[in-house]
Amino acid sequence: MSEAEARPTNFIRQIIDEDLENGKHSMVHTRFPPEPNGYLHIGHAKSICLNFGIAQDYKGQCNLRFDDTNPVKEDLEFVESIKRDVQWLGFQWSGEVRYSSDYFEQLHNYAVELIGKGLAYVDELSPEQIREYRGSLTSAGKNSPYRDRSVAENLELFAKMRNGEFAEGTACLRAKIDMASNFIVLRDPVIYRIKFADHHQTGNRWCIYPMYDFTHCISDALEGITHSLCTLEFQDNRRLYDWVLDNITIPVHPRQYEFSRLNLEYAIMSKRKLNLLVTEKVVEGWDDPRMLTVSGLRRRGYSAGSIREFCRRIGVTKQDNIVEMAALESCIRDDLNENAPRAMAVLDAVKVVIENLPAHHEQTICMPNHPNRPEMGTRQVPFSREIYIDRADFREEANKHYKRLVLGKEVRLRNAYVIKAERIAKDEEGNITCLFCSCDIDTLSKDPADGRKVKGVIHWVSAEHALLAEFRLYDRLFSVPNPAAAEDFLTTINPESLVIRQGFVEPGMQQALASAPYQFEREGYFCADSVYSTSNKLVFNRTVGLRDTWAKNGE
């Protein structure tokens, strides 16, 4: 991560500053604990930047720990993708990758300790009955009939659970806290359940698996985490976090702090719903460029720096808010405007014949790769008698505000000549098939000698040298600002979230590297698609337009 990226300040950093100043901690130790049941999204990027950024700024440590306590939903594919995404974002975890499953034996022993203290019991209510007995926000829960089993009986039954003598759903281990608590999370939460499923790290060695709230706090303590940072939905869970650590024999007691999660307009952050988009084939996969997964953003052409900058700009607070999509797009637009080399592409081509040039006219024009950064060099672009321009850059008639090519009037070709539209050809349906123009041969990259003013500059590619290319114009996947609020979020899919066009690019794009950014002049920022683009078939993804074209109401 660049040192030029400004160090932020927020309430968490203020807490850390106080802890270091008063000697509570001598070093900061954070962690990023994703569950490997899906790909990371932009919301996880905020947590990554917070946890790894704090460790980096305070010269501390940050662990990458996989919360792998549910083998049914987890997969090594997700483990590898998460590691790849963290590193791509510019961060490196301390030491080896860690897994909650590394601590399964210790977690089991702590569960046994709670049983021995009369603070946990084996319950044989069904999952449905447990939910019913738990009560609601307005009514207290009621005790399970199995709550007062003896320590000896609970130890025996828990051993049978571990040995696979109970079927799934017929028994679980619950913490014995308070069924009348105002906090539902403290109403005898389940801390172990039975799952007969192979685990990607431990195989079939276990058939009982600890729940997140039991695992998380103990894993933090075992790793010496000083500041356990979670999003606000875990605020009530902090009471259980502290209860577990207060009631087991463990020397370290980390503290949990909550911050607001990222809520972004026109986006879904639920892994379950993101998975549904994939399984229902609404999108191609987790790395579909319309998905706000880290891999999807990377494939679309977002840089790691732009995502870090977005996370810096939105900051870290305790108040939930909704961030406009324009804020994310602004970060990548600023990045690419500064760093992306320029090139020319025509997405909806119409041929232009410059009749006063010789039939086989060909020349090379030197163009800057960036108008404001000479250190990025130049490129040689071929120019010929026949070129392509964008269909939207010509009108037979237009008012004075239209500063492109009009029949009988002039326009400048980017870094080339001033041309004049003399006549047009149309097909039987009235569609323009060709423009016949003349050029002022003395205007190559300079103004007309007679001083006449030519307003408007358009881009072009040489028809003889142009490369056929596919352009994937991506837009927001959802058509409403808050798709999660819809009864069926799938009904809010934007039908124009992907528009595919066939066009042409200048020949230098033949060797465009996957994900390398370009500004196609007057069209937007694009990159070669990492999946479909080859030297024989060029496919470019639009990362973002040159300017924000969405009003706040999404129109």
From Swiss-Prot:
Reactions accelerated catalytically: tRNA(Gln) + L-glutamine + ATP = L-glutaminyl-tRNA(Gln) + AMP + diphosphate
Major location category of this protein: cytoplasm
A GO molecular-function annotation: glutamine-tRNA ligase activity
TM helices/strands, residue ranges: none
Span of the annotated motif 'KMSKS' region: 268-272
EC numbers, comma separated: 6.1.1.18
Keywords associated with the record: Aminoacyl-tRNA synthetase, ATP-binding, Cytoplasm, Ligase, Nucleotide-binding, Protein biosynthesis
Motif stretch ('HIGH' region): 34-44
One GO BP annotation of this record: glutamyl-tRNA aminoacylation
Residue numbers binding L-glutamine: 67, 212
Enzyme class: ligase
Matching InterPro entries: aa-tRNA-synth_I_CS, Gln-tRNA-synth, Gln/Glu-tRNA_Ligase, Gln_tRNA_ligase_bac, Glu/Gln-tRNA-synth, Glu/Gln-tRNA-synth_Ib_cat-dom, Glu/Gln-tRNA-synth_Ib_codon-bd, Glu_tRNA_lig_a-bdl
Pfam family of the protein (one): tRNA-synt_1c_C
Residues at which ATP binds: 35-37, 41-47, 231, 261-262, 269-271
Localisation per UniProt entry: Cytoplasm
Domain of life: Bacteria
One of the record's GO cellular component terms: cytosol
HAMAP family: Gln_tRNA_synth (MF_00126)
Family: Belongs to the class-I aminoacyl-tRNA synthetase family.
Family annotation (NCBIfam families): glnS (TIGR00440), PRK14703.1 (NF011291)
Subunit structure, interactors included: Monomer.
Name listed for the protein in its UniProt record: Glutamine--tRNA ligase
Source organism phylogeny: Bacteria, Pseudomonadati, Pseudomonadota, Gammaproteobacteria, Enterobacterales
Gene coding for it: glnS
